[in-house]
Amino acid sequence: MAFSMLFTGHAECVKFVKKFNLPLLVTGGGGYTKENVARCWTVETGILLDTELPNEISENDYIKYFAPDFSLKIPGGHIENLNTKSYISSIKVQILENLRYIQHAPSVQMQEVPPDFYIPDFDEDEQNPDVRVDQRSRDKQIQRDDEYFDGDNDNDAS
């Protein structure tokens, strides 16, 4: 028994991935009949080029690969699905098991930093003028010698 999927289902997968508008490299697999591969690649090329293709294949050097009916689409309903639910389930389990061992691509996560992360160490407005500032707080307020402006002329102020 072999897993069979119509090329239209395969083409729908390509159409779905294409919607992400990311660079896309489409490569072949194996284990197909040459007639179905010709149809599959023709349909997928049409999808990738945003071109609607007619069902009739015009005369060309590769027409023999579209035998026996020389049309793009395979008439549905004549292929019996011999796949059992347990077989499909076993394929799914195997795929998920294989995916578990694939190294993920390193990336920088794009997450919003929670606002409570930015807790100011010192806020002049909340300071009580009747309470002395301890040495540790004063040390945090050192003004660098290379800071020339502190006010309206400060170009770094937003």
UniProtKB/Swiss-Prot annotation:
Domain of life, per lineage: Eukaryota
UniProt feature coiled coil, ranges: none
Any one GO MF annotation of this record: histone deacetylase activity, hydrolytic mechanism
Basic and acidic residues composition bias: residue spans: 129-146
Primary localization: nucleus
Root EC class: hydrolase
EC number(s) on file: 3.5.1.98
Compartment(s): Nucleus
Region ranges (Histone deacetylase): 3-50
Keywords from the UniProt entry: Chromatin regulator, Hydrolase, Nucleus, Repressor, Transcription, Transcription regulation
GO cellular component, one term: nucleus
Compositionally biased tracts (Acidic residues): 147-158
UniProt cross-references to InterPro entries, sorted A to Z: His_deacetylse_dom_sf, Ureohydrolase_dom_sf
Region of interest (Disordered), ranges: 120-158
GO annotation, biological process: chromatin organization
Catalytic activity: N(6)-acetyl-L-lysyl-[histone] + H2O = L-lysyl-[histone] + acetate
Role this protein plays: Responsible for the deacetylation of lysine residues on the N-terminal part of the core histones (H2A, H2B, H3 and H4). Histone deacetylation gives a tag for epigenetic repression and plays an important role in transcriptional regulation, cell cycle progression and developmental events. Histone deacetylases act via the formation of large multiprotein complexes.
Entry similarity comment: Belongs to the histone deacetylase family.
PANTHER family: HISTONE DEACETYLASE 2-RELATED, HISTONE DEACETYLASE DOMAIN-CONTAINING PROTEIN
Protein name (Swiss-Prot/TrEMBL): Histone deacetylase 17
Organism for this UniProt entry: Arabidopsis thaliana
